[in-house]
A protein has these predicted regions:
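Short secondary-structure boundary micro-motifs
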Residues: 101, 109, 146-147
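Alpha-helix initiation/capping motif
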Residues: 40-42, 103-104, 180, 189
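Aromatic-rich peripheral "rim/lid" segments of glycoside hydrolase catalytic domains that contact
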Residues: 47, 137-201
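Active-site region of glycoside hydrolase catalytic domains
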Residues: 1-102, 112-133, 166-167
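Well-ordered, non-membrane alpha-helical segments in soluble/globular domains
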Residues: 9-15, 107-111, 151-158
């Protein structure tokens, strides 16, 4: 994201608001959700809405990306895939796979920024996407300390869920069939499921 591209996105948001409000009925006052990078899209440059106090903000967070979604090492990607996140979960066996950014303090600061910029100004916020990949023995990359890797994923999920709720953000875990089998109504990844639930307590 850049200031220039965010300006284009804001113009799209304005078109969206105008189109919805113009249809009348409940769409006159329906809450509308805007997405964008929190560094550039702020209440001060929100598009104009003729209905006051009916805009919400959606935020996605996959930090640190090298831990949550990165699939390949350099030279294919810009960083190495990281297996270990959080205090007490770093590996002494393969330290090159430890996270080097995006750990608790940095993520906490991000939540506080969003709270200050949006929640404290009365703008509802959704954490519309967050999740972390979990490696296993059949993965392309196999952590040498699998227990620490699994705990890293558990702790990240719980942390993100808990901190979201603590500052008034509603979290929505990004789930594409790896955690739940919606056809048979069963849980496929009990650890991730339990980690989400733990974050709500």
């Amino acid at each position: 994201s850049t200031t220039e591209t965010m300006g284009v996105l804001i113009s799209y948001h304005q078109t969206f608001i105008n189109a919805v409000r113009a249809t009348g009925g409940r769409n006159t006052y329906r809450t509308l959700v805007l997405q964008g990078n929190e560094k550039y899209l702020k209440p001060s440059n929100f598009p104009t809405d003729p209905t006051p106090n009916r805009l919400a903000y959606e935020w996605h967070s996959y930090s640190p990306i090298s831990f949550t979604i990165l699939k390949n090492d350099p030279p294919v990607e810009w960083d190495y895939v990281r297996f270990y996140w959080g205090a007490g979960n770093h590996s002494s066996i393969e330290p090159g796979r430890n996270c080097t950014y995006g750990e608790e303090d940095e993520l906490m600061a991000g939540f506080q920024t969003v709270k200050k910029e949006f929640i404290d100004k009365g703008i509802p916020v959704l954490l519309g996407e967050y999740s972390a990949q979990r490696f296993n023995s059949s993965s392309k990359f196999v952590p040498k300390e699998m227990d620490k890797h699994n705990k890293s994923v558990d702790d990240w999920i719980t942390f993100m869920t808990k901190q979201s709720m603590a500052v008034g953000i509603k979290p929505f875990y990004w789930e594409t069939g790896g955690v739940f089998d919606r056809v048979n109504n069963t849980v496929l990844d009990q650890r991730s499921f339990d980690a989400i639930v733990a974050g709500t307590k």
